[in-house]
């Protein structure tokens, strides 16, 4: 209840009464902040054309001050002639009649406070001043409209001057008569921006235009939206991974080829499109070639679908003949001549591949431009380099030259940069200053930069190729093709006569290949074959590619997918393969996600899988910075790179959740590119949604956290974030910024990274990535997941390493036997197909290699009779890696260390043993020698049971979810949480087992003479207790007995193999007391089938069995000590330790 109104309160109100109209006019001050705030509250609301605090609002006040000065000047002149005119009046413009109101030329209404019916906003505003302000606002809108129409007229003149403008009607007419049209145009003809607009003007409303790169989708959508007068994100939009401006009103959408293929995967007939434009088909990207094959099959079933193939004038007949001699509309390119200057560089025989690129030839070009062309002549320089390392080398030297001359702004351009840094190349240099853009081949066709007059062509390009024999990705530098050289030359001369400097001889150009090698002929085809299988396009070997890939590459990919379990023996998709095809990642990363969904490790696996699917977030410059290394050291994990990335992401999320901390500065201090972390967050969310869609993860419930006030605050924050995003998008394409003379480059950090927190209303200072992140993600959920992940127990960490190890298998590397005596930088590792690999410089083990061999110092405590390379230890390790990349050396990328023996027993696809199982060979190249044969047999038997149970549980889970999705009657029993918990405990117990063994890589000669070969075997052993229900049969090539599809028993050559299966010693069963001569295998088989041995009982006994499993080890066995006369249950290690006590 409100308090009673006292006389004192009334007197106070009278004292502070509102001023009268006359008093308000006398005290009125247009520059007063409170006055401006009241006017903004009245006129610049959320629903108005100009919003309070926006960039447009700031522009209005600048205009208003100029208008006021102009009107005051005219008023003072008129007062001399007409002294009776009011002082503070703002009259109409001199060249307009007083009765004219410019609002009739403006397609919107400007309402005042009284018209709005607002209470309180306008009560302190005099009506006369409100009318004056309203008139000034109308003048501003009229002025802005005149400016817009002036820009529009200029834009239309520029469009009409493009070479393709004369061919617009011809393209539309040809498309009307044919289903497929090839539009071939040289660089700069305008095909990418104009053809979609011609279709829009012709009445097509569902147009998709594919681009090979994301940056091209964004830049073209902005340009076409600006030229077509479409509001950004409405009629014209783009759709790329994690980001989309597409809406229900969108008529033209620019999207990546991979995204369109995903849409075809969901809806094979593509009913949502009338016209498909496939741009840059001449680049021959992998997915582009596949898309052309899909469209060739689709078009007969969709006669209403039109397809336009847009290409440079390169091998046009190939595309035309592929689509039944489709008509070609050829458009001329540039209008201005281009002078080609050949500047071959002298060969330097002493230069090695590891040395940096010499930047001096590029600096000489800059000097020649400065001397020959005056700064008043506009024209920027575009330099084509082969890769990021070459860009960094030239960037450093060019920035030094630019700081000395003050005539250049040097900018890098490559796909690893953030969008903000990529957009800088479209900004304008200051007067008298030129831009020098150092680019990879991304600027060859995908990005068009206005104002380029000079081009420097290094003649080199780096391309990724796949070596199926060594199973590695090889990034190599090649000479470009003649077609690429012409494309690069064409970037000059778009706006005037241009110059192309070629840093090679004309004879080199004549020796170039005519066209680049199609990507489908030089990369791994695993993901493509998997996608083809999921789209049911038939046998990949017979698919109608425009140019088929090498048959060996297809066979390698199919064999790899069969090994990974994605395809069965008949090359049909397995349940895990169907799910892997839905995940936009490599097969090994997809396997991690599926395996992690079985256990209670979904959150850490999601983060690690996302981190391994993007480029490394660590900047190149930070690798040589001691300060960055010291700041990043607490985040490094001695378990491997995936766990370091895991720690980095979790720590970044914690920083994000604290309002008082700046995540950009946090990342810069540690040498981390923040936009890579944004990509991880987006990818993590996508993975989570995919697992939820397939029933492998329970959907998150949208919980209402906090009281009503907290929820109101959250809604207000989201509303403010939406407003910031809208302001940024509205202001993004209006005008280009003027670059500074010294544009800092720090591995992709944008201008916002260098600034502190921006004021809420300043759109120029908005970290738009942060805004999008907070709108797209539930920060509280991410923070809770990060907090829980930081407290992973020892058991969870071991289980997580098992999941990673199985997902990455068979990508293993074994350390060289002499690594412990090498320097840190000289650590060598060997894979099955590649010897002499080294750790990537960004690998956490590259700086701490002692972690990899310090564990094996335990071996020095064992008997020294064996060779150093055959040391016995229970802590041998292998490196599991995500990729093997060869540049100047073969590098292991993103490594994690895993226990060698347990991992090989659980994951190897080929496991061969000798007679007593003390010698094992995994996958035909890694030999394990175990000290105790009985322990070896027990461990082998345990691994067989665990493998079978794990595989069965995974198949049942995937089959159960598939039946649920198809709403079929469930035939498979779902995996219970209790069963998963039991399996987890037994896997952990298995990995914790300790048994001395040696590990070494077999030589080629040893591999050739490894097997006993087929032979006459007198009798097949019957060992149901050891190998379960497996039927043993002689192996036709290796010899010995084939137990399972991966295990072959007693096939390895050994001096004692001929007699090992008949050597028996007396043994007493600890359960039933049986005393008989048995071989080691027969002993284990009897123990596993002994009627008096503990067996799996009813559910009530399961907990007791689990407790026993936790307290004892599968390697423990009865041991009678002769020295002390006592009986024990010891592992072999414990036996040795006990014996030493009596020495």
From Swiss-Prot:
SUPFAM superfamilies: P-loop containing nucleoside triphosphate hydrolases. GO terms for molecular function: ATP binding; ATP hydrolysis activity; helicase activity; protein-containing complex binding; RNA binding; RNA helicase activity. Probable ATP-binding RNA helicase required for nonsense-mediated decay (NMD) degradation of mRNA transcripts containing premature stop codons. Promotes the phosphorylation of UPF1 along with its interaction with key NMD pathway proteins UPF2 and EIF4A3. Interaction with the RUVBL1-RUVBL2 complex results in loss of nucleotide binding ability and ATP hydrolysis of the complex. Negatively regulates the nucleotide binding ability and ATP hydrolysis of the RUVBL1-RUVBL2 complex via induction of N-terminus conformation changes of the RUVBL2 subunits. ATP binds at residues 185-192. The gene is DHX34. The modification Phosphoserine is found at residues 749-750. Pfam families: DEAD, HA2_C, HA2_N, Helicase_C, OB_NTP_bind, zf-C2H2_DHX34. It comes from the Eukaryota. Residues 701-955 are annotated as: Negatively regulates interaction with UPF1. One of its GO terms (biological process) is positive regulation of phosphorylation. Residues 368-536 form the Helicase C-terminal domain. InterPro entries: DEAD-box_helicase_OB_fold, DEAD/DEAH_box_helicase_dom, DHX34_Znf-C2H2, HA2_WH, Helicase-assoc_dom, Helicase_ATP-bd, Helicase_C-like, P-loop_NTPase. Belongs to the DEAD box helicase family. DEAH subfamily. This is Probable ATP-dependent RNA helicase DHX34. Forms a complex with RUVBL1 and RUVBL2. Part of a complex composed of SMG1, DHX34 and UPF1; within the complex DHX34 acts as a scaffolding protein to facilitate SMG1 phosphorylation of UPF1. Interacts with UPF1, MOV10, EIF4A3, XRN2, SMG6, SMG7, SMG9, UPF3A, UPF3B, CASC3/MLN51, XRN1, DIS3 and DCP1A; the interactions are RNA-independent. Interacts with NCBP1/CPB80; the interaction is RNA-dependent. Interacts (via C-terminus) with SMG1; the interaction is RNA-independent. Keywords: ATP-binding, Helicase, Hydrolase, Nucleotide-binding, Phosphoprotein, RNA-binding.
């Amino acid at each position: 209840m409100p308090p009673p109104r006292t006389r004192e309160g009334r007197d106070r109100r009278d004292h502070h009464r509102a001023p009268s109209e006359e008093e308000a006019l006398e005290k009125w001050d247009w520059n007063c902040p409170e006055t401006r705030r009241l006017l903004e509250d009245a006129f610049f609301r959320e629903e108005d054309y100009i919003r309070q605090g926006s960039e447009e609002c700031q522009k209005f006040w600048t205009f208003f001050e100029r208008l006021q000065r102009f009107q005051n000047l005219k008023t003072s002149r008129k007062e001399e002639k007409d002294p009776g005119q009011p002082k503070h009046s703002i009259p109409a413009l001199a060249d307009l009649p007083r009765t004219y109101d410019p609002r009739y030329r403006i397609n919107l209404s400007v309402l005042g406070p009284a018209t709005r019916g607002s209470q309180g906003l306008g009560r302190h505003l005099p009506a006369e001043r409100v009318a004056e302000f309203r008139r000034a606002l109308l003048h501003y809108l009229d002025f802005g409209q005149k400016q817009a129409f002036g820009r529009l007229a200029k834009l239309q003149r520029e469009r009409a001057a493009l070479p393709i403008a004369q061919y617009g009607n011809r393209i539309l007419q040809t498309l009307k008569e044919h289903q497929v049209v090839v539009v071939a145009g040289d660089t700069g003809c305008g095909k990418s921006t104009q053809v979609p607009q011609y279709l829009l003007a012709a009445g097509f409303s569902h147009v998709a235009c594919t681009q090979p790169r994301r940056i091209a989708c964004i830049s073209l959508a902005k340009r076409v939206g600006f030229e077509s007068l479409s509001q950004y994100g409405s009629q014209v939009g783009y759709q790329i991974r994690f980001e989309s401006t597409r809406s229900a009103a969108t008529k033209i959408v620019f999207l990546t080829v991979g995204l369109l293929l995903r849409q075809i995967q969901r809806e094979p007939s593509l009913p949502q499109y009338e016209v498909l434009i496939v741009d840059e088909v001449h680049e021959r990207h992998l997915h582009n070639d596949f898309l052309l094959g899909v469209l060739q099959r689709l078009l007969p079933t969709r006669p209403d679908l039109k397809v336009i193939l847009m290409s440079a004038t390169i091998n046009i007949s190939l595309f035309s003949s592929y689509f039944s001699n489709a008509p070609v509309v050829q458009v001329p390119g540039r209008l201005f001549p281009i002078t080609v200057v050949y500047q071959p560089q002298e060969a330097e025989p002493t230069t090695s591949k590891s040395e940096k690129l010499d930047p001096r030839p590029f600096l000489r070009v800059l000097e020649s431009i400065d001397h020959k062309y005056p700064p008043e002549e506009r024209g920027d320089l575009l330099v084509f380099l082969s890769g990021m390392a070459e860009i960094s080398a030239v960037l450093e030297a060019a920035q030094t030259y630019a700081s000395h001359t003050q005539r250049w702004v040097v900018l890098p351009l490559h796909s690893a940069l953030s969008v903000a840094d990529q957009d800088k190349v479209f900004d304008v240099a200051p007067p008298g200053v030129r831009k020098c853009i150092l680019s990879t081949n991304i600027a060859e066709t995908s990005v068009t930069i206005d104002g380029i007059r000079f081009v420097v062509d290094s003649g080199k390009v780096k391309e990724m190729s796949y070596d199926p024999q060594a199973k590695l990705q090889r990034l190599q530098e090649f000479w470009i093709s003649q077609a690429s050289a012409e494309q690069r030359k064409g970037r000059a001369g778009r706006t005037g006569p241009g110059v192309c400097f070629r840093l090679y001889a004309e004879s080199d150009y004549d020796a170039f290949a005519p066209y680049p090698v199609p990507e489908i002929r030089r990369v791994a085809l695993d993901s493509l074959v998997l996608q083809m299988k999921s789209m049911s396009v038939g046998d990949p070997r017979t698919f109608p590619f425009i140019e088929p890939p090498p048959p060996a590459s297809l066979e390698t990919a199919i064999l790899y997918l069969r090994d990974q379990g994605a395809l069965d023996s008949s090359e049909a998709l397995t349940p895990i393969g169907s799910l892997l095809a839905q995940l936009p990642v490599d097969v090994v990363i997809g396997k991690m996600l599926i395996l992690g969904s079985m256990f209670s490790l979904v959150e850490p696996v999601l983060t690690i899988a996302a981190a391994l699917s993007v480029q490394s977030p660590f900047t190149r410059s930070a690798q040589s910075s001691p300060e960055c290394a010291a700041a990043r050291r607490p985040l490094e994990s001695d378990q491997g790179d995936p766990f370091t990335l895991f720690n980095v992401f979790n720590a970044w999320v914690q920083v994000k959740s604290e309002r008082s901390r700046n995540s950009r500065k946090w990342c810069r201090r540690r040498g981390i590119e923040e936009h890579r972390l944004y990509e991880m967050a987006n990818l993590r969310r996508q993975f989570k949604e995919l697992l939820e869609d397939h029933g492998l993860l329970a959907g998150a419930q949208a919980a209402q956290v906090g009281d009503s006030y907290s929820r109101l605050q959250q809604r207000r924050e989201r509303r403010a974030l939406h407003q910031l995003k809208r302001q940024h998008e509205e202001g993004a394409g209006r005008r280009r910024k003027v670059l500074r003379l010294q544009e800092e480059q720090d591995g992709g950090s944008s201008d916002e990274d260098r600034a502190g927190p921006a004021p809420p209303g300043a759109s120029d200072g908005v970290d738009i990535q942060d805004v999008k992140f907070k709108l797209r993600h539930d920060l509280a959920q991410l923070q809770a997941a990060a907090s829980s992940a930081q407290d992973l127990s020892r058991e969870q960490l071991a289980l997580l390493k098992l999941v990673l190890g199985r997902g990455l298998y068979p990508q293993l590397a074994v350390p060289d036997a002499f690594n412990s005596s090498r320097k840190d930088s000289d650590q060598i590792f060997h894979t099955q197909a590649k010897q002499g690999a080294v750790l990537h410089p960004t690998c956490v083990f590259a700086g701490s290699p002692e972690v990899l061999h310090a564990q094996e110092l335990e071996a020095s405590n064992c008997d020294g009779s064996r060779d150093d390379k055959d040391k016995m230890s229970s802590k041998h390790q292998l490196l599991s890696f995500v990729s093997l990349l060869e540049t100047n050396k073969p590098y292991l990328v993103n490594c994690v260390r895993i226990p060698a023996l347990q991992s090989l027993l659980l994951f190897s696809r080929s496991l061969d043993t000798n007679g007593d199982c003390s010698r094992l060979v995994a996958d035909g190249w890694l030999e394990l020698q175990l000290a105790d044969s009985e322990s070896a047999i027990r461990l082998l038997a345990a691994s067989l049971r665990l493998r079978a149970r794990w595989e069965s549980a995974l198949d049942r889970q995937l089959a159960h979810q598939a039946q649920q999705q198809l709403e079929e009657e469930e035939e498979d029993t779902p995996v219970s949480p209790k069963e998963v918990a039991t399996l987890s405990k037994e896997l952990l117990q298995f990995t914790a087992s300790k048994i001395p063994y040696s590990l070494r890589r077999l030589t080629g000669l040893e591999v050739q003479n490894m097997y006993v070969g087929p032979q006459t075997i007198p009798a097949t052993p019957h060992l149901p207790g050891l190998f379960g229900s497996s039927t043993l049969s002689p192996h036709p090539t290796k010899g010995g007995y084939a137990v399972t599809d991966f295990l072959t028993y007693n096939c390895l050559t050994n001096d004692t193999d001929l007699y090992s299966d008949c050597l028996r010693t007396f043994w007493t069963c600890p359960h039933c007391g049986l005393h008989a001569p048995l071989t080691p295998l027969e002993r284990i088989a009897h123990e596993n089938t002994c009627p008096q041995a503990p067996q799996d009982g009813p559910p009530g006994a399961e907990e007791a069995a689990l407790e026993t499993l936790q307290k004892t080890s599968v390697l423990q066995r009865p041991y009678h000590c002769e020295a002390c006369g006592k009986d024990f249950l010891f592992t072999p290690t414990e036996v040795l330790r006990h014996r030493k006590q009596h020495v």
